Amino acid sequence: MSQRAKQIKKQTLAGSPYDTGYEHGKLAEVQIKNSLQTYEKMFREYAETSWDEACDQALLHVNYVKEHYPSFLEEMKAIAIGAKVEFEDILVLNCRSEIALTSPDGCSSFALTQPKTEKTWLAQNWDWKREQVNSILHLELVQDNLPTIQMITEAGIIGKIGYNSHGIGVCLNALRTNQWQAKLPIHLGLRAILESHTFEEAISRIDQNQIASAAHFLIASKSKDIISVEVSPVYTEKILPKHGSLQHTNHICSSKMKKTMDEFAKPDSFDRLCILSDLIDSQIDKSINHEFLFQLLANHDNYPNSICRHHNPALSEQEQTETVFSIAMNLNDAGFYWFLGKPCQYF
C-alpha cells in the first residue's frame, strides 16, 4: 500500500428503526442534503424528471414496502426528521435506481471461495457520480433480534454494500433496462439481504421477482457459499460459481433474462467483465489477502473505462462515472476493508 487510504469514521447506530433512523439523519444531515442536490440535478438533466415527479414515483413503492418491510418506512421517516427534510426526500434516495432506470451506474464485483481460495471473499469497486464521495457513510446498525449490519452507503439510503454478524455479505451491480414495477426498490432489497440470518434466507428475499427494477446482487456467506442473482420484477436468474469464483459488471449475463426486457448496457461493461475474469483466472491463489484484491480492483486496462474507473473527457457530464469507493470483505474472519476514492491511489 503506497499511502494511507482515506476512510470515514464508522458510525454505530443502535435501537429501534426510529432510533437508528433518527441518529442517521441527525449525524448525516449535511451529507444527506448533498445527496438530495446530486439526485435532483441528475433526475432533471438525465431523466427529465422534476423532484416533485420523483417523489410521486417513489411513493408508488410505499404500499409494497409497508406490507413486507414496515420497519424500513419507520426508519426512513426518522431519517427525514433527524436530517430536517421531508419523508418523500428520503424515500426518493432509496428509490433512486427506480426513478432513473437507465442511469449510468457502473461497478465491478467478484466473489471467491473454495476451491479457488481458502477464505470466502466479496469485493467491488463502486462507480458513480464523483459528487457522491461527499455523501458516503460507514454505518454499523445494531438492531434487536436481527444481525448487526456493517455497510458502506450513501447518506439517507438504508441498504447498500456490506455484511452482517451472521457472515452474510452482498455487493451490487446496476443493470440498465426498461423494467419497473411498484415492488421492493433495489436498495431496500440490499437491506433485506443484510437482515438475513442465513445464506438461504438472503436469497429468498430477492429471488421471486420481488425487486422493482433490474439489478445484480452478489451474495456470499461464511458458510463458503457464493451466488450471483440477476433480479427484476419479471424474471430472476441465479448463477452458480465455477471453480469457486463469480464476477459481474453492468450487463445481463442470463440469456433467458435478456429475452424478457430491453437492455441498455454500455460496451465497457463487457470489457471489464472479460478483464476481471482473466485476472481472477490467472492471478488468484488460495492464500490471497485484501490488499491483493485491491490490486485487482486498481486495474487500468481499457482506461479510463477500466475496472478502476476514471473521468472520461469523451463523455457528457450526465454520463460520467468514476470509482467512488472500493471494498473487500472476508466473510470467514469478519474482515471489512474499504476506502474512499480509486484503488490506484493506494495500490
Residue ranges with predicted function:
Residues 1-105, 115, 196-236, 244-347:
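C-terminus-biased signal that marks the final domain/tail of proteins
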Residues 179-187, 195, 199, 269:
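Short, charged, low-complexity patches
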Residues 138-141, 188-190, 219, 245-246:
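Short, charged/polar low-complexity linear motifs in solvent-exposed/disordered segments
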Residues 189-192, 279:
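Solvent-exposed, amphipathic alpha-helical segments
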